[in-house]
Structure formats: structure tokens, C-alpha cells
Swiss-Prot record:
Part of the ABC transporter complex FbpABC involved in Fe(3+) ions import. Responsible for energy coupling to the transport system. GO terms for molecular function: ABC-type ferric iron transporter activity; ATP binding; ATP hydrolysis activity. Its EC number is 7.2.2.7. Keywords: ATP-binding, Cell inner membrane, Cell membrane, Ion transport, Iron, Iron transport, Membrane, Nucleotide-binding, Translocase, Transport. GO terms for cellular component: ATP-binding cassette (ABC) transporter complex. Its main location: membrane. The keyword Transport applies. Belongs to the ABC transporter superfamily. Fe(3+) ion importer (TC 3.A.1.10) family. This is Fe(3+) ions import ATP-binding protein FbpC. It is a peripheral membrane protein.
């Protein structure tokens, strides 16, 4: 059974003066799904978040939430909560007062506020922190307080504006897992903004990649990585080696190196094939067409990041550090594994 589209942007454009920041965007978020807007700085992703929140008004188009046109409604009229990058906590209030502030403004009784604050803090693993203050807890704990403050209101839509960007790597990992866990537990329709690909992949049902105010591609994290639609997508969704290729019914020919043709590849003509670094391995044996030379080696802990020269082109690949220790100038034979290959539709 298909899910109801809970948030919808129809032909939305946003201009600031003569600058078009969002250009005729159409976007839907199914009920209970986490959709992430991913893209480089200035691509328009935060503007979309602010449009959904009601902090900005579109120059053209309509915004719907739960089937209602909210284009001209304020944020207070949209039943939305936002988790900010800066946490936006009140330093003069206790954590319990911060979390319960929204309920207090809604006129909820003191006893109910107290009980719901206790439950909300427990959800984010901060049980018993009601009487502490912002300056007594870490950045990661502050972000969890901000999340509890949003969840306690049981909003129709939850918005995340780069919520993990101020945290270190270990805290980011644990916090993103907590966000995803709670979003799924409470089935909250959510829109998440980040410029971090791994973060987007970890929290999302669907990722929408933007560039210069346009949607470049929409899909699951797996689809975007395995089947990018353009050169921009291939490079933005991780490292990619791009090769000229010739296609036939039986094989793909890259610099004379023939590989079995995947079912979804063209059966004739030429084009561009992309290969992810993890789909290329090095061997001591092979055909002359596979021969390459090591140009650069970087030790990355469990693996080496290796650059080889192959038919005059520099290729990036990853080598398991326990299996091979390549040195600059050494010759090997590269092997391309079909699971990491894709064909690009654009030639630009």
C-alpha cells in the first residue's frame, strides 16, 4: 500500500531580489518518512527547509502539509518543530524548563508538563537531567535536549537544520543513530538538511540532491550511490573513476579491457562508465590492457588509498592494508568488478 504524501511542494520558486535561489521545485515527503536535502553550500537546501517551516514565503508555488495549503500560514500555524544547528537553548532555564517550554506556552498543566518532560529526557538518554543547566552539559547532550524539546510537542512534521555539524565525529555518529531511531519509533514525517553524504545516507529513507537551486536526483541512498544520473552526481556521492567505454551485447570495453556487460548497460555504441574505488582491485597477474603503475599511496588505517596510472589516466582505488602494501612505482594489473560500475547518461 502506497504511503500518503504528507508534505508537498508544488512548483515552488524562491527569489531574493533578482537572485533565484529555488527554481520550480517539486518535492513530496510520504507520511512517516525521513527525506534529506543534500548538496553543496548555497544550493538552496536550507531555503527549502525555511519555506516548509514558514520562515520564508515562496515567490511562486504552493506548500501543502497533511493535505492543507499552508503557503501563507505562519510557523505557529503549521504544527512543525525544528531542531537547529545552534541548539537554540535558553541558558537561564534548566533543561527541564527548556524541554517543557513549548508545552507551557500551550497552557498545558504543570503536572502534565513535568511528566512529559521526564519522558522526553528519558527518550534521549538524559533521564534525571531536569535540574541541570546548559553550561553543565556537553554539546552532544545539548543537541539531545533540543531534540527532546521538539519531540515533546508531537509535531506533524520535524525539521532538522544541519543538527550535527557542531559535534565531533564520534558524537555525530551516535547522535545521528539516535535521531533515526526516534524518528522511526514515532513515525514522524521529517525533512533533514545536511552537506554530509555519510550523514544523509545513515538517517534517510530518501535523499534529494540539489545544486544551484535545482533537484539533481532523488532516490534511496543505495540508488544514488550505485546509479548516479550525471557526472555531478557521480562525483558528489563519493569518489568515482570515469572511463570512456564501448558497448556490445556481450561486453564493455575500457581501454581494451573487456568486462561482461551488465543487463542494464547499452548493447551498442560508446559512452562513459563510472567505477567506484572499492570496485577496483590490484593483482600480480593479468592482461597487458590491465597493467598499471602506482603513483601515490596514502595509509588510511584499515586500507590504503592508492592512485594508479592506467592508460594515461589517474585512477583512485582502495586496497586492504592487511592484504597488500603497494609502493610508488610498482606495476600491477587492475581488475574492475561489475558491482561497482554504472553508466552515465550525460556526456557533459
Amino acid at each position: 500500500m502506497s504511503q500518503k504524501n504528507f508534505v508537498e511542494l508544488r512548483n515552488v520558486t524562491k527569489r531574493f531580489g533578482s537572485n533565484t535561489v529555488i527554481d520550480n521545485i517539486n518535492l513530496t515527503i510520504p507520511q512517516g518518512q525521513m527525506v534529506t536535502l543534500l548538496g553543496p553550500s548555497g544550493c538552496g537546501k536550507t531555503t527549502i527547509l525555511r519555506l516548509v517551516a514558514g520562515l520564508e514565503k515562496p515567490s511562486e508555488g504552493q506548500i501543502f502539509i497533511d493535505g492543507e495549503d499552508v503557503t501563507h500560514r505562519s510557523i505557529q500555524q503549521r504544527d512543525i518543530c525544528m531542531v537547529f544547528q545552534s541548539y537554540a537553548l535558553f541558558p537561564h532555564m534548566s533543561l527541564g524548563e527548556n524541554v517543557g517550554y513549548g508545552l507551557k506556552m500551550l497552557g498545558v498543566s504543570r503536572s502534565e508538563v513535568k511528566q512529559r518532560v521526564k519522558e522526553a529526557l528519558a527518550m534521549v538518554d538524559l533521564e534525571g537531567f531536569e535540574d541541570r543547566y546548559v553550561d553543565q552539559i556537553s554539546g552532544g547532550q545539548q543537541q539531545r535536549v533540543a531534540l527532546a524539546r521538539a519531540l515533546i510537542l508531537k509535531p506533524k512534521v520535524l525539521l532538522f537544520d544541519e543538527p550535527l555539524s557542531n559535534l565531533d565525529a564520534n558524537l555525530r555518529r551516535s547522535m545521528r543513530d539516535k535521531i533515526r531511531e526516534l524518528q522511526k519509533q514515532f513515525n514522524i514525517t521529517s525533512l533533514y538538511v545536511t552537506h554530509d553524504q555519510s550523514e544523509a545516507f545513515a538517517v534517510s529513507d530518501t535523499v534529494l540532491v540539489m545544486n544551484k537551486g535545482h533537484i539533481m536526483q532523488i532516490g534511496s541512498p543505495q540508488d544514488l550511490y550505485r546509479q548516479p544520473a550525471s557526472r555531478f552526481m557521480a562525483s558528489f556521492m563519493g569518489d568515482a573513476n570515469l572511463f570512456p567505454a564501448n558497448f556490445s551485447e556481450e561486453y564493455v570495453d575500457i581501454y581494451g579491457y573487456r568486462l561482461p556487460r551488465a543487463a542494464h548497460f547499452p548493447v551498442q555504441g560508446s559512452g562513459t562508465v563510472g567505477v567506484r574505488p572499492e570496485a577496483i582491485t590490484l593483482s600480480n597477474h593479468g592482461e597487458e590492457s590491465q597493467r598499471c603503475v602506482i603513483r601515490h599511496v596514502a595509509y588510511m588505517g584499515p586500507q590504503y588509498e592508492v592512485t594508479v596510472e592506467w592508460h594515461g589516466q589517474e585512477i583512485l582505488l582502495q586496497v586492504n592494508a592487511t592484504r597488500l602494501q603497494p609502493d610508488i612505482g610498482e606495476h600491477y594489473y587492475l581488475e574492475i568488478h561489475p558491482y561497482g560500475m554504472f553508466v552515465l547518461a550525460d556526456a557533459a
